[in-house]
Regions:
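Classic N-terminal secretory signal peptides
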Residues: 1-16
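General secondary-structure edge motif
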Residues: 12-13, 38, 74
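Short N-proximal segments of mature Sec-exported proteins
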Residues: 22-68
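Compact alpha-helical subdomains of small soluble proteins
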Residues: 51-116
Length: 116
């Protein structure tokens, strides 16, 4: 429950940056992950099956967010490899948060709410 609260707190904090292309890409990716989570909970998928699915989910949204993160990091002076590493870490953090939420919600049928 604490991890779910943390994920939502981060999402709410980031939601204040409306109109920002990076935030829009992040939100699109996050909402796609949430849809995958909710569908998996409804379908009563197991944890290993969900983990396999979520690692590959939302390829278009993931790539868009990745590209924007890399561009932003390079704008701060990061080298390509550093920027890509950072982008991959940020994306994996979102996936891990969704996976953690699934672990909490799978047995109770709990659903996540998409960001507006």
């Amino acid at each position: 429950m604490i991890m779910t609260s943390l994920v939502f707190a981060m999402a709410l904090n980031m939601a204040t940056m409306k109109g920002d292309p990076m935030d829009e890409a992040r939100k699109a990716f996050n909402n796609c992950l949430i849809k995958e989570h909710n569908e998996a909970v409804k379908a009563k998928k197991g944890a290993s099956e969900f983990n396999e699915v979520i690692q590959k989910a939302c390829p278009t949204e993931r790539q868009t967010y990745f590209d924007i993160l890399v561009k932003s990091e390079k704008g701060f002076g990061s080298k390509q490899a550093e920027a890509e590493k950072y982008a991959n870490e940020e994306i994996q953090m979102m996936i891990d948060g969704t996976t953690s939420a699934f672990g909490e919600n799978a047995s109770t049928g709990g659903q996540l709410a998409e960001e507006k």
